[in-house]
Amino acid sequence: MADRVVIGLDSSTQSTKAIAWSRQGEAIAEGRAAIPMSNPRLDCFEQDPTDWWQSCVTALKGCVAELADKGIAPDSIEALAISNQRETLAFVDSNDDASYPAIVWLDERSREEVNSFSEAFGAEEIHRISGRPVDVTPCLYRYEWLRKNEPDAWKNTAYFVDVQAYLVKKLCGGEYRTGSISADPMGIVDMQSVSWSKPLLQALQLDESRLPVIHAPGSLLGSVMPSVADETGLPANLGVYAAGGDGQCAGLGTNCTISDRAYINLGTAVVSGIWSPDYHYNSAWRTELAAQGQGYILENCLRSGAFLIDWFVDQFVARGKADASVFDRLESQASDIPIGSDGLLVQPYFSGVMDPHWDMSARGVILGLSGSHGEAHIYRALIEAITLDQVMSTEDMEKAVDQEITHYVAIGGGANSALWRQMLADASGKPVHVSTTLEASALGAGMIAAFGAGWYDSITEAAQAMAGEHTIVVEPDKSVSESYRELLSIYRRLYGAVRDLNHDMVAFAGKQRRLNSTKAVLD
């Protein structure tokens, strides 16, 4: 049993996980708590920042209590670091209370501001500065939305802060401070100087004094206040170190700290990334600062990942009564269906698409459906579509930066699927290593805490020492590679073939909703 531990705290969209890690990266104890989210109207998603804090307190108390059950005292905790949901923005007044509900990364209310601001400032210049193509996800456009649509809230907001900055303030007091890898997803950081972009701030009419102070990964942000120690069970004056965005922390947690591998999180959304020593920006990815403090993460993201599979099974197969046996049956049946799902091809953009098209009016498409297809065909076609989209994005990334990867490191619930693992290996032609680490983001934060505690001389060294073993390695079946290459070439043509039709249907649906709303008011 470990006698000294660090805590990696992952404050994600739906819950907080506080996990105590040993020097070898073994999870010793954990605490968890949910975070509620509201959906007040179409395309709007909000949270109360105080819920982040209460969830954090509950998770930390649970972790400390489990440590105590194992005979590990609070003073054995040597450091803490936070991984957090990215691109979620809190608005706080001069008393540190919310002046407006926090806008969550899923929110799309600022679509008009995306168009107007990018046209006025220049879409290419925004991309060059921030590393992010113009899209509704970065917080950049939410500042503009609040200023235009909620002027009183804009006036009453003293600080605009990310999740980490908010939690660090609650833990340690003092000024608002955050890690660079939490700041950069806000969309207003100059990615080459790693500082708030003065041109963007000027265009937003936003003073830098209203933003957190940026610190490098592994920097000491503060120490736990005695009152917080009493509330959580943490030792007073425990050092809290700068970690950051959950995506970058997940990459660190899988030890994707060198350029020969890509991590891929087969979760609700599918997120994949590679490390690069140099700054590159391209529509095929969004560029993030790397968690180890050197270089960048080139990241692609498919919003509708495993969500699509769960949605299909829940809505059309199990009718709200899905369990493991349903997925096992579909997996077995789908494994016997030929590549291409007997003529089915899916476009998995059920929630719009980020890279490489950056089109929020894109929608899902099932092409080739006939009466001879069953539920297992659609199940397989969904997995094929998600896989092909990721292979396409990664290959485009490799070509653009002249950097070839040798293998994937897979995490997330989808990595438990033998069908999905083999499909990714076969379609990419690269081995797929499955990480034993179930909570890669919390482990990444734990690695940064371990560096802060002085266990290792660098964050990279901590990652190499603490990353879990790859107990499953799936090799590609070369006999089917040509079939997947042919299917990928067809898939690449699908978006362009249906783009205008999708746009027309989105516009038509919006018009009908407005007509129905008007009719309801008149009635």
Regions found by a protein language model. Give the residues of each.
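Residue-level signal for inorganic ion chemistry
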Residues: 25, 48, 80, 107, ...
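A short local loop/turn or secondary-structure capping micro-motif enriched for an aromatic residue
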Residues: 36-39, 108-110, 306-307
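Active-site core segments that coordinate phosphate-bearing ligands/cofactors
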Residues: 7-9, 111, 118-131, 135-136, ...
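N-terminal glycine/serine-rich phosphate-binding loop of ATP-dependent small-molecule kinases
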Residues: 1-100, 128, 156, 229-230, ...
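Extracytoplasmic ligand-binding clamshell segments of periplasmic binding protein
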Residues: 210, 216, 247
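Short beta-strand-loop/turn "lid" adjacent to the catalytic site in phosphate-handling enzymes
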Residues: 67-105, 133-137, 168-190, 213-216, ...
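A structural motif corresponding to the C-terminal end of an alpha-helix
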Residues: 203-210
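Short loop/turn motifs at secondary-structure junctions
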Residues: 73-76, 210, 387, 404
